């Protein structure tokens, strides 16, 4: 067997653009840098190949025990054992959600058994996941529970190797301030620092946003945010701020003064990040025992089967999985 990391790949929601993007990914030279195992259904793969006009030529395997990387570096495990399922296109539905959950569950089992070093998946649809039986808010919560992770986890968004994380996420604005505590702020600071080191960045510079306009007109900066930054510095983390939200992306991202930024609430980060590069973005599930990456965009039902979806986020998401898994593979070999 070669020394390349092993990455489990999932096609994403079969009703959206995931299968066509992943089919193209598997024919891109970037995937030659890893051992790849596509986990899914043959009918979905064939749909993706047909739309994208490529042939992946993956080596079939009934299960992981049949995977032999001395024979090649790209395998396909059909979790249906040859069943020919069909899925309605361009709409959220239970069948598609259940298919994604089945593939993801299989990949997570391989990760728990340390048979793969990372997971990279095509875009999923949260509505389909819930219709398909997911009992959690999204795939991130599902993965955390499946892997038995009790520690803090959060979602990272990445554009041009600039990373973001949030103290609060999908909660009402009226509830944000009460959740801004030094303890809660320190958690994503520590996690993003650790994750960036794992991705190969040395001494990452961590910016922390303010909560209030211009970092004034409130006490959260003085009472909670600054103490969290100071505590991070004591831990050896190169943290700075608080930066006013309205100019934070100019300072940190455009002027390249920081490598990542921590925001206090969802839109304080997402508006800036998406304005600067949503078409290139990647989502990383932070805090899990295995790197998990995906394009930041959704299933794009409106352009499904048109073969016009931008490949860049898919390539970028695989590259991050590759960077992180190389270090994980080396540490366990």
Segments the model singles out, each with a brief description of its role:
Residues 68, 157-179, 183-186:
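Ligand-binding beta-strand-loop-alpha-helix segment within the catalytic cores
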Residues 127-131, 151-154, 163-165, 173-175, ...:
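Short, well-ordered, mixed-charge alpha-helical segments that flank or form enzyme active sites
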């Amino acid at each position: 067997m070669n020394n390349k990391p092993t990455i489990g790949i999932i096609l994403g929601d079969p009703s959206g653009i995931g299968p066509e993007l992943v089919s193209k990914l598997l024919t891109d030279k970037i995937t030659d840098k890893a051992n790849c195992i596509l986990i899914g259904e043959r009918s979905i793969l064939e749909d993706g190949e047909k739309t994208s006009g490529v042939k992946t030529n993956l080596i079939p395997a009934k299960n992981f025990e049949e995977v032999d990387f001395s024979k090649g570096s790209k395998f396909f495990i059909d979790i249906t054992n040859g069943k020919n399922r069909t899925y309605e296109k361009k709409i959220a539905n239970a069948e598609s959600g259940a298919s994604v959950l089945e593939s993801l569950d299989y990949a997570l089992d391989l990760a728990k058994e340390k048979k793969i070093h990372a997971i990279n998946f095509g875009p999923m649809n949260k509505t389909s996941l819930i219709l398909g039986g997911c009992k959690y808010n999204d795939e991130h919560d599902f993965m955390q529970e499946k892997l038995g992770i009790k520690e803090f986890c959060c979602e990272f968004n990445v554009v041009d190797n600039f990373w973001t994380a949030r103290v609060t996420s999908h909660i009402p604005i009226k509830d944000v301030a009460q959740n801004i505590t030094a303890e809660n702020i320190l958690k994503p600071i520590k996690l993003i620092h650790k994750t960036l080191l794992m991705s190969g960045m040395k001494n990452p510079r961590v910016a922390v946003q303010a909560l209030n306009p211009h970092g004034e007109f409130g006490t959260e900066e003085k009472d909670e945010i600054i103490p969290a930054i100071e505590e991070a510095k004591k831990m050896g983390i190169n943290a700075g701020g608080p930066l006013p939200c309205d100019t934070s992306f100019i300072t940190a991202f455009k002027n390249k003064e920081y490598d990542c930024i921590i925001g206090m609430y969802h839109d304080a980060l997402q508006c800036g990040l998406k304005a600067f590069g949503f078409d290139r973005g990647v989502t990383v599930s932070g805090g899990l025992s295995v790197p998990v990456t995906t394009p930041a965009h959704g299933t794009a039902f409106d352009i499904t089967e048109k073969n016009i979806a931008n490949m860049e986020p898919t390539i970028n998401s695989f590259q991050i999985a590759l960077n992180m898994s190389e270090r994980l593979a080396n540490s366990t070999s």
